[in-house]
């Protein structure tokens, strides 16, 4: 039976081969993220203090923050493929350097370098996916990209635990090896994507152009506030679970539900979310995330905690693929990498502030934190939601501008000073 609305399977089949290669490389890279989850354990077993380990992890965060801006610039100037390969080969070297570091200053420097080089590829990957996929398929493409990302994280730690029993060196070697493999795949099989001619690039001009895009600034502002909420999952949420009397293992099991839901449910959910204006879906997702976290103020049992996770994960699945696709629609083709880098930068910045905010409020009163999460999510939704009739013209809809979007995508590739992505 023929239908106007394409099925999920048909949309996946319509994705170009390079997109699937990018998904494969992303899965391999995230599967091989062996060192960071075990870094605290590795350092403390070598005689370093928890404060030392925290300093090293903070150095990684600072490096990743810098990578968001630099990676977007490189993606638009030297090209997506070269940026991905540069990132993967550099982080492989950084991991081997970290494995041989013995003093705390050397370890901190190596982890900073790993954060910088390891996160350079993200804006380039997101921008390359937008280059390859026309607007009507972008929500599906970014959902598939996130599925590969989360599936790698889901299966990687078990392998890392096995390698750690054979010696921590194998964690570093495995991490470096999978990164280098993704780098080789990028050079051999990925297209270079769009990139700006060198004479067109300029940090000040780029910043001025992005700062003049009010729609994009609203997206960044809303994303920062919702990131402050969502990132409680890796800090205060664990304290909340153990405060209720559950063991740390229970936190791990409850949290694993988030990854399982994303891997198996996010792609099918795009069949629904892609039918609506993107800003409405982003706002709805923000409200669901806020509801899931704010309900922790009432959660006292394991089923209640599971319900909270399901609700905020549903919000994550609704908003994340739509957000990436929407930013790709907003971005001029010659600034696509920098737009993606700026979006990544908001999350990196929130990663610095979210634990501080969460810990302070949790120390005052846990309920105050969870209610604040609901308020911040509501604020993010208000910032992003369209008030004017017809959506205010905030970029192309995933369903309403298919033919127009396709011609816009092709025109952008021809007229923006960019090269053909193939």
Residue positions per predicted region:
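Juxtamembrane intracellular "pre-TM" segments in multi-pass secondary transporters
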Residues: 2-16, 191-221, 412
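Helix-loop boundary and gating motifs at the non-cytosolic
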Residues: 12-61, 216-222, 226-254
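Residue-level signature of mid-helix packing/kink "hotspots" within the transmembrane helices
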Residues: 34, 61-69, 153-154, 259-263, ...
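Conserved MFS/SLC helix-loop-helix module at the cytosolic interface between two early adjacent transmembrane helices
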Residues: 66-102
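Structural signature of the two symmetry-related core transmembrane helices
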Residues: 82-96, 280-295
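Helix-loop junctions at membrane interfaces in 12-TM secondary transporters
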Residues: 99-110, 297-308
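Cytoplasmic helix-loop-helix junction between adjacent transmembrane helices
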Residues: 110-149
